[in-house]
């Protein structure tokens, strides 16, 4: 579900096209996040342009990623939020705790 590339010291993570982050995928995505983050810190850009839908389980997975990033000293930036996802982030005031480009 996630694609990972290291470019110039930045870990670039993106969702596969037409992805949804809901109850069915949240556990798998959380496990992938753990594998990416464990170890030394760094910079991560999570490109969400292909993420069409996020439910409460998906929000939980993203909050878990944020917690992991803080624990392992990663600088996390979210990018390319679709309008519906951005609206959800604004409604839940997640834009106040995530760095979003």
Predicted regions and their residues:
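Conserved beta-strand core positions
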Residues: 2, 11, 44, 74-76
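STAS-typified acidic loop motif
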Residues: 5-31
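A short, glycine- and basic residue-enriched loop/turn
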Residues: 18, 51-54, 97
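C-terminal structural segments of small proteins and small subunits
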Residues: 68-100
